[in-house]
Amino acid sequence: MLPRVTKLNSRLLSLALLGIQIARGAITYQHPDDLPSGVDYDFIVAGGGTAGLVVASRLSENSNWKVLVIEAGPSNKDAFVTRVPGLASTLGAGSPIDWNYTTIPQDGLDGRSLDYPRAKILGGCSTHNGMVYTRGSKDDWNSWAGIIGDQGLGWDSILPAIKKAEKFTQDFTDQSVKGHIDPSVHGFDGKLSVSAAYSNISFNDLLFETTKELNAEFPFKLDMNDGKPIGLGWTQYTIDNHAERSSSATSYLESTGDNVHVLVNTLVTRVLSASGNGTDFRKVEFAVDANSPKKQLEAKKEVIVAGGVIASPQILMNSGIGERKVLQAVGIDTLIDNPSVGKNLSDQGATSVMFDTTLPSTDFDVDAALTEWTNSHTGPLARGARLNHLTFVRLPDDKLNGQDPSSGKNSPHIEFQFAQITPQVPTLGVPKQAPLPAANSYRLLLQLAVVNLYSISRGSISLSDNNPFTYPLIDLNMFKEDIDIAILREGIRSAGRMFSSKAFKNSVNKFVYPPADATSDEDLDAFLRSSTFSYVHGVGTLSMSPKGASWGVVNPDFKVKGTSGLRVVDASVIPHAPAAHTQLPVYAFAEYASALIAKSYN
């Protein structure tokens, strides 16, 4: 979760409107009129985000195939700020490279509407997220495999593919890395750069002392990506060995040949039947904006929709694929009647808690740090989040009201992500009503994002009209189920135990948010309804299901049910949120889909 754009962000985004093409082979076009005539594309990918660029890159490995990617946002090359790891928190809602969605008012959140950041730039959310690299638990993958009916997505089957895609960049004997990860669970020859966090501040020693005192609740975890993430350990990031963000745009697209064409600043509005009235959806319609002419192109083989958890169901519904009564209400003719389209939105609810401490601030001069990074790719902006640790907590059974929404016993219910709050670069979705430190503060104001990894409330994406340029209605249905608020309540109490430990006795003064006297269930629930936000890890709006199932939108081969020539590959097909930040699962699903597609054409 990232906050609204800051003055710093606006200044940085204006630094480097470079206007250069993607390096190496892929060819970028800024306007539909610039596309070359007479080119027959084998595959057209609707959306140049995390998944879309993986698919385009992998399919382009067959030099006989031509691939077109159509992306609504600009090239990532035009946004210098996205390259700098330490400035990730300045992106998101309010940014010119974000869609700037908001949800409808949430009944469970005192009627509040929430920001719902989604990237509008080449590389998608891998270009503007927090870069955290987590795989989830092996239970998540086995759960998905069982739901979908494809054991190829089970943990033991998918792990080699995950490792194949990864390029871990650090020397394991380096003291800044040694003891932070387990080399045996990583890959070294893939496209996506991954590195372990490092920092040398007093907070680290205190935090890891809690793994001794409170080992049952916060055991030390060497590597959270081994399939059993429960515990406290070091964060891993998609940052390369030059201290730059690694995204699908930088790691996959930049290694393609010239058989990939990329059209930016252009929205895919619909997929169309190639015959005009059938179920063979191999044609796309696209336009620059609502007032510009719409153009069409037909793929020789397939159209692959990769717009993400919000845009992909919007594209399908505008194309006549969805629930008949919903489409009729906005004047869209139904071609494929499927009530599952846009349903099953699974996301992670989160809140921020803050502690006043006597620890020294890790704040720094942003301008000086930016100069250092620009000159040498070193300094505080060469890293990801300010405090480089994650904790995954599994709650005891007696705190779950007789329910266990997790994927299994290896799976946590809660995540803590740590940060320092500063006036210059706020992080992790600091609520507007939360206290912020003074600009001259020399003490660390510690923040934890407390995340419910397995919210069982399900939301939806729907249309308000039949204009593809109108934003869809996003309903998270937050706290529809009581267990979701109960888990966050227990997460706050767990955080309190961590920072009331002996290790922090002389360093942490008190809760400042929520107030220290908010201890009852009723007080904490009121706090949560007023402060909870989305961690923006939504999945499931075009959920995958077994072939022949009466529910779901795509089959295990990623083909849209009832159609030919049309697949969906992105977060929308994942049945439920994992115990993870979702970028790695999206990469893995995209790698898996790419192999299936290529194999289907031998």
From Swiss-Prot:
Q: Where in the cell is it found?
A: Secreted
Q: Family per UniProt? A: Belongs to the GMC oxidoreductase family.
User: Its Enzyme Commission number?
Assistant: 1.1.99.29
Q: Enumerate the active-site residues.
A: H537, H581
The signal peptide annotation in the UniProt record is 1-25
- Induction text: Induced by carbon starvation.
Q: How does activity depend on pH?
A: Optimum pH is 9 with ferricenium ion (Fc(+)) as electron acceptor. The enzyme is stable from pH 4 to pH 10.
Q: Which UniProt keywords apply?
A: Carbohydrate metabolism, FAD, Flavoprotein, Glycoprotein, Oxidoreductase, Secreted, Signal
Oligomer status and interactors: Monomer.
PANTHER family documented for this protein: GLUCOSE-METHANOL-CHOLINE GMC OXIDOREDUCTASE, GLUCOSE-METHANOL-CHOLINE OXIDOREDUCTASE N-TERMINAL DOMAIN-CONTAINING PROTEIN
Tell me what PTMs the record reports for this protein. N-glycosylated.
Protein known as: Pyranose dehydrogenase 1
Annotated InterPro entries: FAD/NAD-bd_sf, GMC_OxRdtase, GMC_OxRdtase_N, GMC_OxRtase_C
Q: How does activity depend on temperature?
A: Optimum temperature is 63 degrees Celsius with ferricenium ion (Fc(+)) as electron acceptor.
Record GO cellular component, one term: extracellular region
Among its keywords, does the record have Transcription? no
Which residues are sugar-modified?
N100, N200, N277, N344
Q: Which Gene3D superfamilies match?
A: FAD/NAD(P)-binding domain, Glucose Oxidase, domain 3
Could you tell me which residues carry Tele-8alpha-FAD histidine? Answer: H128
Query: What is known about what this protein does?
Result: Catalyzes the single-oxidation or sequential double oxidation reaction of carbohydrates primarily at carbon-2 and/or carbon-3 with the concomitant reduction of the flavin. Accepts only a narrow range of electron acceptors such as substituted benzoquinones and complexed metal ions and reacts extremely slowly with O(2) as acceptor.
Q: Which residues form a coiled coil?
A: none
Please list the cofactors this protein needs.
FAD
Provide the cofactor note recorded for this chain's UniProt entry: Binds 1 FAD covalently per subunit.
Q: What is its main location?
A: secreted
